[in-house]
């Protein structure tokens, strides 16, 4: 059962952390979105895999059960802006990590307020200049 005081880890490390292609892809994503550590990227990967797993399990269900459960998932994803209201489960399965990371406040600040780098946008958010 575990100790209720200690929180559960919300990220998973990659299976092969020293894969060159994976390292280069991670560094490119970290630089593009101004992430502080790779742990933030792993959190996004884990959250996206959780959502995609829910969509795959809905596809495996029967038609009546699927019609009842699918709007709940789609409503929650459209509420946070990952998919449109009239999208399907295939759109959920086609989501990328960049879609999830582009919903962060520092990414919006970087695009809208025209900071030179995403790291400057991150600093503005952390220091409370942008709320």
Residue positions per predicted region:
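Extended polybasic, low-complexity segments that bind anionic RNA or targeting/receptor surfaces
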Residues: 115, 124, 128
């Amino acid at each position: 059962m575990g100790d209720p005081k200690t929180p559960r880890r919300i990220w998973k490390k990659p299976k092969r952390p020293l894969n060159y292609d994976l390292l280069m892809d991670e560094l490119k994503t970290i630089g593009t979105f101004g992430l502080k550590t790779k742990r933030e990227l792993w959190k996004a990967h884990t959250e996206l895999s959780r959502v995609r797993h829910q969509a795959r399990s809905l596809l495996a269900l029967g038609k009546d059960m699927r019609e009842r459960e699918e709007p709940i998932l789609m409503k929650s994803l459209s509420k946070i802006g990952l998919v449109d209201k009239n999208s399907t489960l295939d759109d959920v399965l086609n989501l990328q990590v960049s879609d999830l990371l582009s919903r962060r406040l520092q990414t919006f600040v970087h695009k809208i307020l025209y900071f030179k780098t995403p790291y400057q946008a991150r600093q503005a958010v952390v220091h409370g200049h942008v709320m």
